[in-house]
From Swiss-Prot, chains A, B, C, D, E, F, G, H, I, J:
The active site is at C31, D38. It comes from Chloroherpeton thalassium (strain ATCC 35110 / GB-78). The gene is queF. GO terms for molecular function: preQ1 synthase activity. This is NADPH-dependent 7-cyano-7-deazaguanine reductase. The keyword Cytoplasm applies.
Length: 116, 116, 116, 116, 116, 116, 116, 116, 116, 116
């Protein structure tokens, strides 16, 4: 994974708390146990402070997971950590919803709130 | 964009707090980076004070974005600013939901609350 | 409109706060600007005090709007006023959802709460 | 109606507050005004105290309404009263949703909370 | 049932409260009254403390119910007890939704919260 | 069952083959084996010859099944026979779709075509 | 009803058989028996010959039914007759789907094919 | 599997070709390779000749697959063979739709037609 | 409109008849009567002969309609003509589905088949 | 791509024409133009002759496309060719449905029929 791929641009409305949600239904990584691909939808929700994440760079950041072996829980928390570091938001949440494996479906949700 | 297109009429029930929601699923603007059109749904929710926005004028106001190059975040905040200025509501919220680009879907939500 | 059409019957369980919701997806009135018909769904929700509204009389009350020219906001607030007057409920809410005009959909929501 | 049909069994987990929801989409009674059948879905939600309602007996209790003439509001409150008496729950709610009559759909919701 | 089948792995992000939801729509057990199979969906939601439940072991744990005679309420509370014991979470919830029997559908929801 | 309840009116467009479909999702009869009610949707499709079936009389005809013990297959064929006899259509089809019993759902479809 | 309201324009592609479908979900007329309004969706499908129906005039033609007392079967066949006369199509079909009355839903379908 | 569990009753309308569809969404068997359970929906469609299959016996016949190791293709063809032998229908079709394994969903469809 | 924007590439499987469907839900043009934008979905289906249409060039071709005043029927037939000329397919169909105007929805379908 | 990964097993019912459908909604390959991943659903339908395709081997065969650059049309025809060669079916069809790119969705369908 390469968090350095993430680019930002300046928030034009820093005085107003507003929410940006970016949904990527085409996320794929690899199960470190079986070596088989996992498929999921990654939802990013945040309230920007001074920076917004640039969409195309976010897409390229996500693409780096394509051939990486990593568990659901760690995908979710890693993306949250990388994006918090890059964007320094007021609040941020990552929801990862995974296609069924063995008939069983998993969703992981992690949140961050900046100290006030 | 021409906020002066926005017309209002007098709220007949100013003593009661009630909510008006106006959904426009046929909004289109242009991506300033690629020059390609963006398509979205703009939802306006507000509690009127003394004025209500006139529907037809709102439609013509939205149409002015058709060939304008502007980012998702700025569309949302600009519409909120223009409508708050024209309608002077008690509360107002703009939700813009955008069709997928590169497989990725974006929603931006901004709110305003009048000082009491 | 004829609020005198509204009939009530005695609430058999006045000591318990319970909710009655009545949805009419076949409401129609006339746009006072264009003279063309509007179509909507009117949802009535209330907590009865001593009276409940009689269903058939409510239907006939709604029918009186069929050829009346009246704006969305006023339909909603007028129905709320008429029903509050007839039923004297503890709480009441009217939600009117209107079919698209010019591609734009409107919903108006108004509430009433009796003084305690 | 025969509330004596309702049977209960002992709650095996009385120290934990948990919720049981039982949905019957095949409820039918008779309109006392027209003599025509009404069709509805009855949803029962409760937090058991020492007793749980036995499913088959609940089904037979509901069947007793099949040829009884009774209004929507009274069906809902009567079922709540009968079940509260039989099951002595910590909390209980009855939601009755009725098929359209004259194009109009009705839902009645009544709740009970035991004194603590 | 064999709670000893449940395996855990170390939570890599113990300092952050995040939620894991695991849905199994292919659960089946046997009705102790009729000897006929029951079919349901078991949803597990929890905030891990130091441990996460291993998915494959959870699947094998669920499979042990396949030929066991047990009531809906007990399935739900037993799974909660076994998982709380194995995973020692901060919070945990089990929702069991059962296919209709005699036209009637049942859902049981039980929760656990660790003492703070 | 009382086929004599079925009333007809004269087809105003006998020279044109057109189709009438009448769907009754509120049909109920009784299972002759268990004595428990069955619930279903009866769909009638026909091409009228000289007569059309009158809607209200059809409703009253269907109501006669409410407390009658009769199997799915026989309900379907009996309704087809009674309606063919009363309406003398060019073509007619009855589709009965029944709510699940023991988790199993049944649909029966029977057709009639007049000799040409 | 006023078939003279129907206007047409010249088909620009008379040498190609193509299909035009126009769906009006906001049709309303009056039941001649009860005097109560009926609500339906009218679908028009046709292959134009030399003429196409003008949309706005079609809308005004439909509006004339708003306060007319007329049965479902006759609405359908009358609209077909009026449109065939005005548009002289190669083929035409009218489907009228009506909201439930007494829990029962009706659909009427009538077709026309020009002699070749 | 025990085809001898299948019971039949006499078709009361042998002179009319009509269709019976019986859908069982609660079918389960075991994968002979992995020993893990498979879940599917079995749809049976047939035109009876002199016999109809009795619903309860069909349910018990299906239950015998619960702990049997058998492939999708063979489940489908075996059920068709057993039912054709027991019911001697004019036509019969079995559709088995299986829940995803490894993200992949399978449906098998087999038909029988009696010689005329 | 600029048909010269359409680019093609060589069909790699010219000996097999196969179907390509390309759906564009983001089509917009302008109503020549009102000057207001129309929104629609254009579906292209074809069996290639020696050429396939290049996707990006198709997108740019569609974009040329954005500010052009043209009726539904002509959009559909014009696109068909331009694509037939550029791609020389064995068969081709264009379906244009338009968002409601005045509550009324229109779909136009036109087909082409090469002489054999 | 490695067609040699495809394994088969003997069809146990070679005398009966029956259909097997296998849907893989987790297919991904790479666009040869942009180097970005494509996502699609591959549906395989076939009537087996003497052989059936083994599910797990089919999954591994599909996985080989994960990092291959190949156009939609060629994916579809290549899979058909490989599977026809391995399985020698009576009939076979491949349907590939691709997620939107630039707002535009593509579906490719190719079929094979053995000579009789």
């Amino acid at each position: 994974m390469k968090p350095e791929l993430l680019e930002t641009f300046e928030n034009q409305y820093p005085n107003r708390d507003y929410t940006i949600e970016i949904v990527n239904p085409e996320f794929t990584s690899v199960c470190p146990k079986t070596g088989l691909p996992d498929f999921g939808t990654i939802t990013l929700q945040y309230i920007p402070n001074k920076l917004c994440v640039e969409l195309k760079s976010l897409k390229y950041y996500y693409l780096e997971f394509r051939n990486a072996g990593i568990f659901y829980e760690n995908v979710t928390n890693k993306i949250l950590d990388d994006l918090v570091k890059a964007v320094k938001p007021k609040e941020m949440k990552i929801i990862s919803e995974w296609k069924a494996r063995g008939g069983i479906t998993t969703t992981v949700t992690a949140s961050y709130e900046a100290e006030k």
